[in-house]
Amino acid sequence: QCELKEEQESWDNLVASTGWDRVVLVGGEKKSEIGKNIQEIGEQRGLSAEECMMDLLLENHGDAPIVFYSMCQQDVERILWSPESIVISDALYSEEGLPHPRRYGSFSHLICTYKDQIPIEKIIPKITSAPAKRMGIENRGSLKTGFKADIVIISPEKLKDMATYERPRQYPEGIEFVIVNGKIAKENDGKGASGFFGHLIV
């Protein structure tokens, strides 16, 4: 518990830089505590935040997923403006608890938030062709002859990010079709695909 309060040489102590009030529990067996920060849960239990985190880990057999509110918006925007920057999502997939809203709304959030500051024709390459090129993924990320037909058809005027930290499992509005390898994987009317059309890229 003492180590949780101090910076460490062997691992990054995000708590030391953010504070327990910016560490939110997003999963676990006690549903009433999901969505609350660790400091708040600790106060309700009559424990220090460090003791509370230890108890949560024990109660959930080591699986107590959390979200850190540690980003500086000014830093994010300064990097985003760079022509060399790309945007990806590292959202984790789970059927339980509250996933990070980026799992459902990363790219719609990006477009909706910055469409008045960055032309959409400059935003789209940051989430398609540029990441594919950076990762060395051939034949994907662009609408070109011979490339895989991975296509998202959107209505820009209808596009709206719906995912929030409180209600993250919401798909964005305004996405008409998602096409994977030339086959329709998702339609805006809620109709899903009859199969899985993607494959592992290594």
Predicted regions and their residues:
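C-terminal cap of metal-dependent C-N hydrolases
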Residues: R78-E84, S89-D90, P101, I151-H199
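Acidic/polar loop patches that form or flank catalytic/metal-binding clefts of enzymes
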Residues: E50-M53, P65, P119-P125, K186-N188
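Flexible loop/turn segments at secondary-structure boundaries
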Residues: E59-D63, Y93-L98, P131-R134, K160-M162, ...
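Active-site neighborhoods of metal-dependent hydrolases
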Residues: Q1-T113
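Gly/His-enriched, cation/cofactor- and phosphate-binding structural elements
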Residues: S106-K133
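Acidic, glycine-enriched loop/beta-strand segments at the rims
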Residues: A64-V76, I120-I124, A132-R169
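Short beta-alpha connecting loops at secondary-structure transitions
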Residues: S94-E96, T113-D116, M162-R167
